[in-house]
């Protein structure tokens, strides 16, 4: 018995690449949001969990290279995994504070 040929009726959709953008604040721009800076300085773990929750991720990865890389690629922010590794290694508090400030600003612009 002959089999009928398989016909594909759906085509792959168009995926829009994220447009290039930059960080909303610099790495050491603590005074643009003192609340985030104080939270990161005195309760680093809490801020990391807030960032992870904002991104719908596990709270254990809020301060990792993977979280920063995911965020950077999601919003088309230039950089590399090596850059992300160096920032999170040598300045973890500044890294998480920058992520939180960026999330807050993008949320205020309805872009998060």
From Swiss-Prot:
PANTHER family: DUF614 FAMILY PROTEIN-RELATED (PTHR15907). GO terms for cellular component: nucleoplasm; nucleus. GO terms for biological process: brown fat cell differentiation; defense response to bacterium; negative regulation of apoptotic process; negative regulation of multicellular organism growth; positive regulation of cell population proliferation; positive regulation of cold-induced thermogenesis; positive regulation of transcription by RNA polymerase II; response to cold. The lineage of its organism: Eukaryota, Metazoa, Chordata, Craniata, Vertebrata. This is Placenta-specific gene 8 protein. It holds the Pfam family PLAC8. GO terms for molecular function: chromatin binding. Belongs to the cornifelin family.
